[in-house]
């Protein structure tokens, strides 16, 4: 009778785990994705969510590496993006790319009709000057500079609200319908912005310019939203009075907190300044002294 000893098997997969810089989790290599331009590596789920968020929010057309300290400042290639997002998300991304190309091309512009949105070609020889443009799709004639009805021989009225209009509309009824227009153009970069409902304080995703939806006045420096307390836009913000007061209380509290912090820290700064200056002078004097021979 022969007996054999049982020898346990220790064949364990000892493949190293890699750390994701976004979620700080550790994953095997097959669950990670490497960006080809910079060789930064992230878990596939985090990178997919990051890319989808930027595309859906329309924040970027060139999607950069999510690592803010990336030494090469790499960007994801189009084929890399296409491999990780759904088909409809990729179509939206390509649409954003096309809109960006038209925006940066001085020889192309968008038809201002909200029902058309075709791309119109400008005369390259006169691209720096206002010129009449006719849409190839809806035949609407408009000015390339102010986007209003074609006004050959007359100066552009730059102060008119920048709203979209339908074919056949003229300037008289455009002014009366400007508040109800669902689509307007950013007064700074001229891109289209659509508003369904809600707050009248708008921020352009393209240039980050804050403005009033009704009169297009800049709100970049109006932290307390005083604009909606007087004038034609009074009480048109779209929020209750209580929520506006709460917003202002928060803003004032933030500024007051910074002021109080500066007030408390100022005596310590005054006391520390002479010591810092003395240390700097001493270090400089030590550098200037010749080495002993």
Swiss-Prot record:
Chain positions recorded as Zn(2+) 5 binding sites: 212, 215, 227, 233
The EC number(s) this enzyme carries: 2.3.2.31
Active site location: 199
Binding-site positions, Zn(2+) 4: 186, 189, 204, 207
Zn-finger (RING-type) residues: 20-70, 186-215
Organism name: Danio rerio
Residues the record lists as binding Zn(2+) 2: 111, 116, 135, 138
Function: E3 ubiquitin-protein ligase which accepts ubiquitin from E2 ubiquitin-conjugating enzymes ube2l3 and ube2l6 in the form of a thioester and then directly transfers the ubiquitin to targeted substrates.
Coiled coil: none
Cited Pfam families: IBR, IBR_1
Family (UniProt): Belongs to the RBR family. RNF144 subfamily.
Record note on domains: Members of the RBR family are atypical E3 ligases. They interact with the E2 conjugating enzyme UBE2L3 and function like HECT-type E3 enzymes: they bind E2s via the first RING domain, but require an obligate trans-thiolation step during the ubiquitin transfer, requiring a conserved cysteine residue in the second RING domain.
Protein name, UniProt field: Probable E3 ubiquitin-protein ligase RNF144A-B
Catalyzed reaction equations: [E2 ubiquitin-conjugating enzyme]-S-ubiquitinyl-L-cysteine + [acceptor protein]-L-lysine = [E2 ubiquitin-conjugating enzyme]-L-cysteine + [acceptor protein]-N(6)-ubiquitinyl-L-lysine
């Amino acid at each position: 009778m022969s007996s054999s000893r049982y020898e346990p098997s220790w064949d364990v997969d000892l493949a190293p785990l890699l750390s994701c810089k976004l979620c700080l989790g550790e994953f095997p290599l097959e669950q990670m994705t490497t960006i080809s331009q910079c060789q930064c590596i992230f878990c596939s789920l985090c990178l997919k969510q990051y890319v989808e968020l930027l595309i859906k929010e329309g924040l970027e057309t060139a999607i950069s590496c999510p690592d803010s300290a990336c030494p090469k400042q790499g960007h994801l290639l189009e084929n890399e993006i296409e491999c990780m997002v759904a088909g409809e998300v990729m179509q939206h991304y390509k649409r954003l790319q096309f809109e960006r190309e038209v925006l940066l091309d001085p020889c192309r512009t968008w038809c201002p009709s909200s029902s058309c949105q075709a791309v119109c070609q400008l005369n390259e020889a006169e691209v720096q000057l206002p010129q009449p443009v006719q849409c190839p799709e809806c035949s609407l004639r408009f000015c390339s500079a102010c986007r209003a009805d074609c006004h050959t021989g007359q100066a552009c009225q730059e102060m008119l609200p920048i709203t979209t209009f339908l074919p056949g509309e003229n300037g008289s009824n455009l002014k009366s319908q400007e508040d109800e227009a669902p689509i307007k153009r950013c007064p700074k970069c001229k891109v289209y912005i659509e508003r369904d409902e809600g707050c009248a304080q708008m921020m352009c995703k393209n240039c980050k310019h804050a403005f009033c939806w009704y009169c297009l006045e800049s709100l970049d420096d109006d932290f307390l939203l005083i604009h909606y307390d007087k004038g034609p836009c009074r009480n048109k913000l779209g929020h209750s009075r209580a929520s506006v007061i709460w917003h202002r209380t928060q803003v004032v509290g933030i500024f007051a907190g910074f002021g109080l912090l500066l007030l408390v820290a100022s005596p310590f700064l005054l006391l520390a300044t002479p010591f810092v200056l003395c240390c700097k002078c001493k270090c400089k004097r030590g550098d200037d002294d010749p080495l002993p021979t």
